[in-house]
A protein has these predicted regions:
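Structural motif marking the loop-to-transmembrane transition
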Residues: 1-2, 201
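Sec-dependent signal peptide recognition
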Residues: 2-8
Length: 305
């Protein structure tokens, strides 16, 4: 097992060929956010829509926010953004887990955006066939969602009070968000996430955004690759969880990411990580609802109170 992980790691760090002209995201985003004028009843969900425009194309994103019973407006409040899996919705975590009771237990506001089929990419290409919206999903989280929460609900206003987590593709998204925005999130967690695209060159989801690996290996290695960006997690607490019977995203995706963090740590960095493999668990809500207890406890320990 260890030899296989090291081999995968070596492949991920070395491969960098292929004539794919790398393309960075370009475009202008326009959205208006102002203080919420509706009624917030602590102990309930608020359902909202974010309206934004990117390169002239307008879009709406649904989200729901849980405000615990002791919530006080304008108080700096601990906030956890919860990302769902591929083609999920803002209803996934509330419907399939005990997030409300955990939010009450740890006094945290919970934000569940509807992110559709995004892979939390930062750019689209001519070969991209999977566009969840006009703006790449990875950019939306940092450039629209978080500023909206800050301006409208006074949530996620401080890094050390804000966490981000996700399951499956959302786990990849949470880790990427923390890597890209080290001053925005005080802790991050990924459950059943995929973090090393180069080790899965036949992954059709990844190809739907970045083009086929055989044609664009440099994109797969250099763009939106959590392994490549891992160094930016220095000082950010990270929780990784995976079921050992996961046949959709193999547990080696989390294990190899830990190997990468350990390697960076040996080079002098400080990486605060928790890695948990859940015996006899697969890629489903039985695991994700169970592991949520560990993740929320982790956020309670790592985020400021």
């Amino acid at each position: 097992m260890k030899r296989m992980l090291l081999l995968l790691l070596a492949i991920s760090l070395v491969i960098g060929c292929g004539g794919a002209g790398m393309q960075r995201a370009s475009g202008s985003v326009d959205f208006t956010a102002s203080k919420y004028t509706g009624t917030i009843t602590p102990g309930t969900w608020v359902h909202e829509q974010i309206r934004y425009k990117y390169d002239g194309e307008e879009a709406l994103v649904n989200l729901q926010i849980y405000f615990p019973k002791n919530y006080t407006l304008r108080k700096t409040y601990r906030t956890v953004i919860m990302l769902h899996g591929y083609r999920g919705s803002q209803r996934d975590w509330p419907a399939n887990s005990s997030i409300v009771s955990l939010a009450e237990l740890y006094s945290m506001a919970i934000v569940c955006p509807s992110m559709g089929s995004t892979l939390y990419e930062s750019v689209y290409f001519p070969e991209t066939t999977n566009k969840w919206g006009p703006m790449p999903g990875g950019l939306f989280v940092s450039n629209v969602l978080v500023p909206y929460l800050q301006k409208t609900f006074y949530l996620a206003t401080k890094e050390n009070y804000t966490g981000i987590m996700g399951n499956s593709t959302g786990g990849r998204g949470a880790i990427l968000a923390a890597e890209r925005n080290p001053n925005m999130f005080g802790a991050t967690a990924g459950i059943s996430g995929d973090y090393d695209p180069v080790s899965m060159p036949r992954n059709r989801l990844h190809a739907s955004v970045y083009g086929p690996y055989k044609d664009f290996p440099e994109r797969w290695q250099k763009i939106d690759n959590p392994m490549e960006l891992a160094e930016r997690l220095k000082g950010t607490p990270i929780f990784l969880g995976h079921g050992d019977k996961d046949s959709v995203v193999p547990k080696e995706q989390s294990l190899i990411f830990v190997v990468r963090l350990n390697q960076l740590e040996k080079d002098g960095g400080k990486y605060i990580k928790v890695n948990k493999v859940y015996p006899y668990r697969m890629h489903n809500w039985e695991l994700w609802s169970k592991s949520l207890h560990d993740v929320m406890r982790f956020f309670d320990e790592k985020l400021e109170k």
